[in-house]
Curated annotation (Swiss-Prot):
Entry's family note: Belongs to the AB hydrolase superfamily. Lipase family.
InterPro entries associated with the record: AB_hydrolase_fold, AB_hydrolase_lipase
Principal subcellular localisation of the protein: Golgi
Cytoplasmic side of membrane: 1-16
Species annotation: Schizosaccharomyces pombe (strain 972 / ATCC 24843)
Name assigned to this protein: Probable lipase C14C8.15
Keywords, in A-Z order: Glycoprotein, Golgi apparatus, Hydrolase, Lipid degradation, Lipid metabolism, Membrane, Signal-anchor, Transmembrane, Transmembrane helix
Superkingdom, taxonomy of origin: Eukaryota
Length: 460
């Protein structure tokens, strides 16, 4: 590239970062103005936006069931609306964070251990999400956790530090910047092992399976790669759309942000919670309007069409999708994705980020050390997953399953995922875990032999 070309490229990148700064500043200004408005005036604007939306897009008005799901306050309400009960648990990590944990089971009389008689499965959510993201589907048949509960698995929904259900620390308030001083390393080293240890302590099993989505999947990879005790406790791992190595950046603005120096990202987003504004607008905007804004944002910045997710499903899901995390986690994820290596957090303040520096080599998570059955499920149109790059890093005993025409969010929200994604998850877990176990409990619980054979052969 010529000198003029390099200068032009440099100017474009800096210009795009400047535009990002301006957009963030503009959003902050609107948010502050909205906060200081009197409550009656905010309610008036809310009602007016609802009327305008209803007039121009009446065909997209949500039905009563969707309204109830949209208005659900938490994971407990969402599960109840779908006919399931939920137990709340709390896990204390060794560095002082209190993590909310949700155990899902059928609304039937009897002990949980009798209803959920198969080994436990832990679900790990993605970036800026919480446990609600797994159960905010329009139909219960489209929620992966519910499908596993119906199979008899002991299902647990995790909540990582900083989100809606894990906003406590024994030393620091969430208003203290020290509360938010954690990267993905802290989650991999403290949160996931603590959650797994707790789950195994409250039931009779000595092993567990993991299901992670997006960033949740890469966190599971990281935790398993460095913790021998954790590896010995995990029977199988299903990674849904692990966002380690994006296939491509859909827009120059996103590319410029991801490739920006870490200190510049801190200057843009601060050092506390990441994009708390998303949670704010989610609370003050009419849900269909908020869903439209999110949809436009995802289309513009990430080129996600969302064509496999119905408009009503988007309205419900986007009302529960976002939660808090630290800016440091986002910066860490940006370091991982731009280098396409699952590495530890780079503390170097150097202007030009590099996997190798003059002084040190950033530590990489040795995921090739993981020796357990791993299934990677991803969409063919998912621009957050470069499967060819991932294949070079995946450990033995791994298999990759591609879902045609699926994008990133389709894996957990797609309209057709019941017959595609859920089927794959259930089959993989049944194949790896349930074979020997079904035989061992057949007599103890009086299970019908024909039923057991049907489940194992995937004929029922």
């Amino acid at each position: 590239m010529t000198l003029n070309g390099n200068i032009m490229k440099y100017c474009l990148e800096k210009g795009e970062i400047l535009i990002s700064f301006l957009l963030i500043a503009l959003e902050s200004m609107f948010r502050i103005c909205t906060v200081i408005l009197p409550s009656p005036l905010r309610n008036w604007f809310y009602e007016q936006s609802k009327k305008v939306y209803s007039y121009f897009l009446p065909e997209l008005l949500v039905d009563d069931n969707a309204n109830k799901l949209t208005d659900a306050r938490d994971t407990i309400d969402l599960c109840a609306l779908h006919g399931y009960d939920l137990e709340e648990h709390f896990v204390r990590t060794t560095d002082g964070y209190l993590l909310g944990l949700h155990r899902v089971y059928k609304k039937k009389k009897g002990k949980i251990e009798e209803l959920n008689y198969l080994p436990p499965v832990l679900f790990i959510h993605g970036l800026m999400m919480n446990s609600e993201s797994w159960v905010c589907n329009l139909k219960k048949e489209d929620a992966i956790p519910f499908a596993l509960v119906e199979q008899g698995y002991d299902v647990w929904l995790g909540n990582l530090r900083g989100n809606k259900y894990s906003i406590k620390n024994i030393k620091f308030s969430s208003q203290n910047p020290k509360f938010w001083d954690f990267s993905l390393d802290s989650i991999a080293i403290f949160d996931i092992p603590s959650i797994v240890k707790y789950i195994l302590s409250v039931n009779s099993f000595d092993s567990i399976s993991l299901v992670g989505f997006s960033q949740g999947a890469i966190l599971a990879f990281a935790a398993l790669s460095i913790d021998t005790e954790l590896r010995n406790s995990v029977r199988a791992f299903i990674a849904l759309a692990p966002a380690i190595a994006p296939k491509k950046y859909s827009g120059r603005t996103v590319k410029s942000i991801i490739h920006a120096n870490s200190q510049l990202l801190y200057l843009m987003f601060g050092r506390n919670s990441m994009l708390g504004s998303a949670v704010f607008w989610q609370a003050v905007l009419y849900p269909p309007v908020f869903a439209k804004i999110v949809d436009l944002f995802l289309r513009f910045f990430l080129s996600w069409t969302g064509k496999n997710i119905s408009e009503t499903q988007k309205i419900v899901a986007y009302s529960h999708l976002y939660s808090f995390t630290s800016v440091k986690c986002f910066v860490h994820w940006a370091q991982i994705t731009r280098r396409k290596v699952l590495q530890m957090y780079d503390d170097s303040p150097g202007f030009k980020p590099s996997y190798y520096t003059n002084l040190n080599r950033i530590a990489r998570y040795p995921i090739e050390n993981i020796r357990l059955p791993i299934t990677l499920v991803y969409g063919s149109n998912d621009n957050m997953v470069d499967i060819e790059t991932l294949k070079t890093q995946l450990p033995p005993l791994s298999q990759c399953i591609q879902i045609p025409n699926y994008e990133h969010l389709d894996i957990i929200m797609g309209d057709t995922k019941k017959d595609i994604v859920i089927q794959q998850v259930v089959e993989q877990l049944n194949h790896v875990i349930a074979g020997d176990y079904f035989e061992s409990i057949k007599e103890e619980f009086g299970l019908d032999t024909e039923l057991v054979d049907g489940v194992m052969n995937h004929t029922i």
